[in-house]
């Protein structure tokens, strides 16, 4: 996938997830995410928003660790879904300028993570969809590329 295709996939995913989150109740936002049982739907969204926030603010110490991810979730605990979506929207133009500068394979890995969490949220809400999206194609490409670069037959 080209950098532009990955950036387009993220923009589409962000819009799709925001639309989905606007359609849910407060109770649904507190539903446990089956594949991330320590998180609620709102916590998962907080992480999805927290990664771009951290990139924008240069908060990359411990990137991709549990501690880094937990900081994203914890700082948004008091926020409502509406607050989270407003923050995501406010940061979108700045992150759109950063996103194409992220080198591969990190760019596609970011997209893989975002796509995974979109579908984590969808599973928790019982609202499947977006399985034919460009985000899925980017994620599949990331997995295939990762496997082809890794010579370990156990992986």
How should each PLM-predicted stretch be described?
Residues 1-8, 28-33, 37, 60-70, ...:
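Structured surface interface patches that mediate subunit assembly and partner/cofactor docking
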Residues 2-35, 41-46, 50:
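N-terminal "assembly arms/tails" that initiate or stabilize quaternary assembly
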Residues 18, 45, 85, 89, ...:
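Non-transmembrane alpha-helical segments in soluble domains
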Residues 21-25, 52-59, 125:
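A generic secondary-structure signal for well-formed alpha-helical elements
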Residues 40-41, 80:
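Short, structural beta-strand-to-alpha-helix junction motif
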Residues 41-68:
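Conserved alpha-helical segments that form or flank metal/cofactor-binding pockets of metalloenzymes
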Residues 74-91, 98-103:
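A short, structured beta-strand-centered segment in the mid-to-C-terminal lobe
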